[in-house]
């Protein structure tokens, strides 16, 4: 059995939401009652071109070589990932072509393709070829 109780905390929350706290850079939005950020009209972008020195180049090359060495060591030491395949997982990640876990599914796929091809062949052979048909070169 569910009961509903009323308390005065709801009115406190309502009163707290009506209190207006003005913050620097924030103006109140009269539409939704939500604060909106004030817009600053000036945006300054700058770029500096620092000449590369040989010290930074050698440091970059050393760090690149160290990271490549660490990646190669991790790749050679780690074992290949083996998947635990359960019947509930079907054929995901097992490497079977087209995800066919049963030979009957392959024959069904081949039969549907053959049926569609045969129906198209019968349909196309009944078309009359004239200059405007687009079937002849």
Curated annotation (Swiss-Prot):
Topological domain spans for side Lumenal, thylakoid: 84-103
Q: Can you tell which superkingdom this protein's organism belongs to?
A: Eukaryota
**In which compartments does the protein localize?**
Plastid, Chloroplast thylakoid membrane
Per the UniProt topology annotation, the Stromal ranges are 124-137
What range is the organelle transit peptide? 1-64, 65-83
List where the protein spans the membrane.
104-123
Any Gene Ontology CC annotation: chloroplast thylakoid membrane
**Any idea which UniProt keywords this protein has?**
Chloroplast, Membrane, Photosynthesis, Photosystem II, Plastid, Thylakoid, Transit peptide, Transmembrane, Transmembrane helix
Q: Which InterPro entries match?
A: PSII_PsbW_class2
Q: How does it sit in the membrane?
A: Single-pass membrane protein
Q: Name one GO biological process term.
A: photosystem II stabilization
What is the recorded function of this protein according to its Swiss-Prot or TrEMBL entry? Stabilizes dimeric photosystem II (PSII). In its absence no dimeric PSII accumulates and there is a reduction of monomeric PSII.
Q: How does it assemble?
A: Part of the photosystem II complex. PSII is composed of 1 copy each of membrane proteins PsbA, PsbB, PsbC, PsbD, numerous small proteins, at least 3 peripheral proteins of the oxygen-evolving complex and a large number of cofactors. It forms dimeric complexes.
Similarity section: Belongs to the psbW family.
Name of this chain's protein: Photosystem II reaction center W protein, chloroplastic
């Amino acid at each position: 059995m569910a009961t509903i109780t009323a308390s005065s905390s709801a009115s406190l929350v309502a009163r707290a939401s009506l209190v207006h706290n003005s913050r620097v850079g924030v103006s109140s939005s009269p539409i939704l009652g939500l604060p909106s950020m004030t817009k600053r009209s000036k945006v300054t972008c700058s770029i500096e071109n620092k000449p590369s020195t040989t010290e930074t180049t050698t440091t970059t090359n050393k760090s690149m070589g160290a990271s490549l060495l660490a990646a190669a060591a991790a790749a050679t030491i780690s074992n290949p990932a083996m998947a635990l395949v359960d019947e509930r997982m079907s054929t995901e990640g097992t490497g079977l072509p087209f995800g066919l876990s049963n030979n009957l599914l392959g024959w069904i796929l081949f039969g549907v393709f053959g049926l569609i091809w045969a129906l198209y062949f019968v349909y196309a052979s009944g078309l009359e070829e004239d200059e405007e048909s687009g079937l002849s070169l």
